Every structure is written in structure tokens, then in C-alpha cells.
Amino acid sequence: MAQEKNTEEQIIEAARKIFVKRGLDGARMQDIADEAGINKAMLHYYYRSKDKLFEIVFNEAFSKVVTPLGHILEGTRPIEEKIKEVIDHYITGISQVPYLPIFILSEVNQRPEIMIKRLNAQPSFGSIMNFMKEVIEAGKNGKIREVSPIQLFLNIVSLCIFPFVARPLVQGIFQQDNVQFDLLIEERKKMAADVILAWLKP
């Protein structure tokens, strides 16, 4: 049983690497088997198709970062508090699965309809839409500056995601090792929140 669990974990880890590198369309089951150090027959014993594997890898990564946002955005707390917590959680989550932004962007470019359908099906999607309505109402009531909730969404996502997407460039240009980069990311939580909240001041 322990051996089976270990083999499954090896396969998932191998699939993650191959999907990030090549996307769903470019990945082959043989590539995943080779990466996992097993034969193709054994891979098919555990997982019948690469679509099933992709679903597992996607949901595993996505659930760590995006799914909990629904709980953060629900409730009656001030918008400012929600934004601070969203940014903190988002950056922390991506730090744990740093391949996720490139993974999603790659699939959005290759198969936009399918990826958008997947994103819309996530449990947190409704909470995100409700929060955007909340932003509109808060702007009308003078609690925050009147802004487009879409612009707010784009600003938060870009401030959080870009450093991870550009990590090789940032570390290369500024000669940062991994420890220094991790410190930069930790500092970015407050910086990103400060930028967004300053912009939202009425």
C-alpha cells in the first residue's frame, strides 16, 4: 500500500513537471512515465489518460491558491481587510506552487475555452463575483474610490503574480539568490497591499 502511494506521488510529480514544461497538448504519457522512472504500462495502470492526470495536477495546485479565496472574500469585513488577506494568501500560496501562474497562462493560450470553463467551475468563483459587486457598492457609497472591479482584480493579480513569472529575470538582473528572492516576495505582501489600498482611498 505504501509502495502504491509512493508510486502515485512519483507519477503526479512527474506529470507536474511535464505539464509545466510542455502543456497538456505537448505532453505524452511516455514522457511522464520516463520522468517518473516507470514503464508506460504501469503508468496506465494508475492513470488511464493524461487528461485525468492533468485534472489532478491542476486541481491540486489551484486548490492551494485560489479555492481558499472564497472564504476570505465572504462575510461583512471591510473591503480593505479582505484585500490585505487576499494578497497575503495569494503570494503565500503561489510561493508554495510557483509553477502555477505559468502553468495556467500556458494553458489559457493553448486552450482558452477549456481553461476558462475550469476556472468558472471553481467553488470560489461565485465569491469573487460577489466581491466585485461589493467593490462597486462601496465606491458608490463613498467608502472607497469608485474604480472598476475588473481593474482592481487585474492590479491585485499582476502585483502578486509578476515576480514569480519573471523570477529568472529578476534574480539574474539583480543578482539575487533564492534566499534574497524569497525575502523580496515576503516584503511584497505589504507593498502590494499598500499600493492597492492607497489607490482605493476615496
Question: Where do the language-model regions lie?
Answer:
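Amphipathic alpha-helical linker/stalk segments
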Residues: A2, V57-E85, L119-P123, I128, ...
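N-terminal intrinsically disordered/low-complexity leader segments
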Residues: M1-N6, E13
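Short, amphipathic alpha-helical "lid/cap" segments that border enzyme active or binding sites
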Residues: I12, V66, K84-I87, F153, ...
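Short amphipathic alpha-helical elements of helix-turn-helix/winged-helix folds
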Residues: A14-I18, L159
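Amphipathic alpha-helical segments used for helix-helix packing
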Residues: S95-K117, R167-Q175
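C-terminal peripheral helix-coil segments that are non-catalytic and often amphipathic
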Residues: T92, Q96, F125-N141, R145, ...
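Helix-turn-helix
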Residues: Q10, I18-K52, I56-V57
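Hydrophobic alpha-helical connector segments
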Residues: H71-I102, P149-F153, E186, P202
